[in-house]
Structures are given as structure tokens and as C-alpha cells.
Amino acid sequence: MHVTITVPEETTAGFAVAADRDPGDLAAKVRRGLPRPLGAAVAGHLGTPQLMLTCHPAGSSPWNLSEVTGDDEDDALRARQAGWHIGVTCVLPASDLPSGPHLARATAKAIADSLRGVPVDLATGRTLPATRPDRLDDFFLADDWLGTVLPPYRNSGRCTADEDDIDGCACVALSTRGLGRFGLPELEITDVACPHDLAALNILRTTAQRLLPLGRHPGDHTLPGELLLTSADFSAFWGNRDPMWDDGPIAVRLTENASGRLGVLPPAAFPGTLNEWLWDELPPVLHELLGWDLERAAPPG
């Protein structure tokens, strides 16, 4: 069965900086905090709908940061308790994707750095890690754009299924939180057994990368009944050009689970269960690669 997705003419992306003091002249902080040519690109958009800056005391802020999470719990706590919220928002035509959200996020990071604040991705509800200065050509989805993280191991110890049982449980449900700003539906995969959580995560990552180019083309797009995911798709997710596996493409089936949300399933012809497919049919690298150091030129292959 085919799936049709509708890419909007415009999308909105937003970030916030949680800070402990009034930031003063935001535009000046941005100009000083970004390297060229990124700084020049940002300066050309400041004050337009493509890059708007606002500042609010936390008590009257339009953004609720009280449930922000992140890999660094100290940063997450600081974000939840900060007295000031600086918003970086953008309304973007499809032609400005994915560079527009990239510029907005770089702006938020520059403001956070100047104020010793904490940048927050409003789509994912997570803090943004400190990384090297962003470059115009430095966009890749692996750089914290999907908001998808693995759950606590074995459901925080509550899962009692045998680890060697391929289909022993269905504890894991994963979903993206961030594709909407690229004009795309969010993706989810559910009923995954604990031992296959990383493979399921990498299937979501690769599917997201496969769909990403559609976000630049407004209108209806009818996808085939089964989408073919290639080694090049997984490589591009990491910002890499080297092959990540040697075999052919992986077929996945997409389903319309809800408005703006697609489910990812095994191909219809696969005779077994989701977990058997995750275990038996995927390249080994999808079971192995969780992340890599962003300072490196390429992920391990």
C-alpha cells in the first residue's frame, strides 16, 4: 500500500537559550559569536521571519522548559531553573531547508556561549551539547536533529525476558521528534524487544535520512509501498560518504499511524516478526553504531 505525505510550503523551527541574566544586545552577541561565513549568513537573516530573536523572563516565557532533559543532567537542571529565556525562531520556505534550522540553531548556540547559558531544542525538549562551531556545509541529521534516544536498558531492569530470546519482549518504542521542522512526518517503530533497540534506532535514522530531500519540495509525495534504504543513506545520516555496509538495500514498509506520523515495519513479504527481521535481516553495523565523536571527520565503518 502506498503512503502519501504532504510537504508544506513553510515550516517553523525554534530553539531557546536558558540564561541567568538579561542578555542585552542579542544581535551583537550573535555577530561576535559566529565564525565567517556562518556569521554573515546569520546577519543577513536577523530581524526577518527567517530568524527572529526574543527575550522573556522565565515567569512570562512562552516556552515551558520545566521538563527539559539532556545527556548532561547539570545542563538540563540549569535550563529548567533559569531566570531568562531567549527564543530563536524561524519561519522558513521549503527552499531554505535544511540550512534554515541549521542557522537558527547556530545562533542559539552563539547566544548561549556568550551568556554561559544552555541552548535547548524546542522540538525535542533536550539540551544541545557543546560542539565545534557550526559551518554552513556542516549539516547532518546525526548532529542531534532527531531527538530520538534509547530508553533505559531493559526497561530500567523491569524486563525479565531472556536476553537470548529474539522475541522475548516488546518493551521498546522509539519515535523521532524533529523531522517536522524539515517538512516531514515524524517516524516511529514500536513493540521492539530490548536486545534490538539499537538496530531499531538505526532503522529510524536511515529512514529519516532517506526522506530528508523531500522536505525541499512542497506538495504531495506518494511513496512506494516499500522504501529501499541504502548504505549511502546511513552514511549520509552521519555526514559521511564512505559505505557503511556492503550488501544491497534494506526494504522497509511505511504505515500512516496518525496525522503527521509514519510507522516503520518490515517488508510485507517477510514471514516472521518485527524482532526476527531486526535480528536476521539487517547489516551488522546497524546493531553496533550508536554514535561517534563529532570532532572526528567520519564515523567508524
Label each PLM-derived region with a short phrase.
Residues 34-43, 109-120, 209-219:
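Structural alpha-beta junctions
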Residues 1-31:
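N-terminal alpha-helical "arm" segments
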Residues 126-290:
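Aromatic/basic-lined ligand-recognition segments
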Residues 9, 45-47, 78-82, 246:
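A short, structural micro-pattern
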Residues 19-77:
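N-terminal low-complexity, intrinsically disordered segments
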Residues 21-27, 93-98, 127-128, 260-263:
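Short, surface-exposed beta-strand/loop "edge" segments at domain boundaries and coil↔beta transitions
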Residues 54-178:
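Internal, hydrophobic cores of structured domains that mediate oligomerization or house catalytic pockets
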